Amino acid sequence: MAGAEVEEEAGIPKKIESTEEVLIKCQCWVRKDEEERLAEILSINARVSPSKFYVHYVNFNKRLDEWVTGDRINLDKEVIFPRPKRQLEEDTNKKQKKKKKFPQKAAVVESDAKSSEMGEGSDVMDLDNLNVRGLKDEEISREDEIKKLRTSGSMIQNPHEVAHVRNLSKIIMGKFEIEPWYFSPYPIELTDLDVVYIDDFTLQYFGSRKQYERYRKKCTLRHPPGNEIYRDDYVSFFEIDGRKQRTWCRNLCLLSKLFLDHKTLYYDVDPFLFYCMTRRDEMGHHFVGYFSKEKESADGYNVACILTLPQYQRMGYGRLLIEFSYELSKKEGKVGSPEKPLSDLGLLSYRAYWSDVLITLLVEHGKEVTIDEISSMTSMTTTDILHTLKTLNILRYYKGQHIIFLNDDILERYNQLKTKKRRHIDAEKLLWKPPVFTASQLRFAW
């Protein structure tokens, strides 16, 4: 098996007496939530007393990484130290020499196995290859995944930045205290502070409450600095041009990076439009979430980055953002898809949205419909539609063609959707025309 060949290099277990002996890349047992978890030391801050250690819990999401003090590290158990680089190279060379023995025999066995699999039921098309190249069920390392990221849009190839240690401990926005998930390139003077204050309306950042309150008294802005293109009794949407509102959009990118890992946001915001969702009260329009969109996307993406702030998550706002992005695509007369790769939370949200839209359309349409017709009605790409149908397990191969089969589970899910009181975007309240940019307006300075 190919997977058996990939082995993690074992470290050197060692008993230590003090946390002063702990080094970066060591693995040790750390107390968290009344249990001990194996964690890797990513950084050490010796400028404070007592020293703090930035840890990543092995096999857990990166957003759980945190700073811990030495008293949470269990020194009764052995600490695993990384092997010296020279020893690693010697071990790697030995393994490569072993792999060179009998390579042809292994290859023949593998090819025979593949040919026997293809021989049976070869008249059934493999749905994994239906216009969905690049989404195979394969395991790739984090480094390989970073190399595959796009270098246009909201992505850049910078593995060092992706691996940064989270640098802010806590932010306060309005009445909410929020713990950031990831690194964001805020000014270095803010990184040693216990709390950073971020204004609810301008997204400007401050190192002290006094600075923030003085600024708030003078600032009159009470909504995102753009055109309000949608309003209902629940939310509003504003369209902001990154070229016209650089400072506000850069502040938005800094805030977003605290909660987005895969996406590495450009500091140059000129190529993007930002669509910001707000909730209104007597104070003004409070920022809830947003998605950005390239003014001219060569890949046909209708979303570059999408985020609902943590204090508003699990309240249906993310779904409204997704729905709104497709309403814009319908107005443009185009199909669209979010920029890949999506974050884990983003992927779950999109899959749920695509599934619900397709189930509702297929049940209520009640007639034969092609994939292209579904695409034109929903503005979803055929790739996203086929993936979703495959995930729902309702795409069948029958008499030489693919058909969509609505089983009892799908009908039951449709009935459940109808009983849910979800909010939706009212297309009639969208006052917007697709912006048109000249060649000079799309010429961005670098």
From Swiss-Prot:
Pfam families (alphabetical): MOZ_SAS (PF01853), Tudor-knot (PF11717), zf-MYST (PF17772)
Catalytic activity: L-lysyl-[histone] + acetyl-CoA = N(6)-acetyl-L-lysyl-[histone] + CoA + H(+); L-lysyl-[protein] + acetyl-CoA = N(6)-acetyl-L-lysyl-[protein] + CoA + H(+); 2-hydroxyisobutanoyl-CoA + L-lysyl-[protein] = N(6)-(2-hydroxyisobutanoyl)-L-lysyl-[protein] + CoA + H(+); (2E)-butenoyl-CoA + L-lysyl-[protein] = N(6)-(2E)-butenoyl-L-lysyl-[protein] + CoA + H(+)
Segments carrying motif ESA1-RPD3 motif: 246-267
Entry keyword Transcription: yes
Keyword entries, A-Z: Acetylation, Activator, Chromatin regulator, Chromosome, DNA damage, DNA repair, Nucleus, Transcription, Transcription regulation, Transferase
Entry's Gene Ontology cellular component terms: NuA4 histone acetyltransferase complex; pericentric heterochromatin; site of double-strand break; Swr1 complex
Site (Important for catalytic activity) residue list: C305
Residues involved in acetyl-CoA binding: A304, C305, I306, L307, T308, Q313, R314, M315, G316, Y317, G318, R319, S343
CDD domains: NAT_SF
ZnF endpoints (C2HC MYST-type): 196-221
Post-translational modification: Autoacetylation at Lys-263 is required for proper function.
EC numbers: 2.3.1.48, 2.3.1.-
SUPFAM superfamilies documented for this protein: Acyl-CoA N-acyltransferases (Nat), Chromo domain-like
Function according to Swiss-Prot or TrEMBL: Catalytic component of the NuA4 histone acetyltransferase (HAT) complex which is involved in epigenetic transcriptional activation of selected genes principally by acetylation of nucleosomal histones H4, H3, H2B, H2A and H2A variant H2A.Z. Acetylates histone H4 to form H4K5ac, H4K8ac, H4K12ac and H4K16ac, histone H3 to form H3K14ac, and histone H2A to form H2AK4ac and H2AK7ac. The NuA4 complex is involved in the DNA damage response and is required for chromosome segregation. The NuA4 complex plays a direct role in repair of DNA double-strand breaks (DSBs) through homologous recombination.
Assembly information from the UniProt record: Component of the NuA4 histone acetyltransferase complex.
Family the entry assigns: Belongs to the MYST (SAS/MOZ) family.
Designated name of the protein: Histone acetyltransferase ESA1
Organism phylogeny: Eukaryota, Fungi, Dikarya, Ascomycota, Saccharomycotina
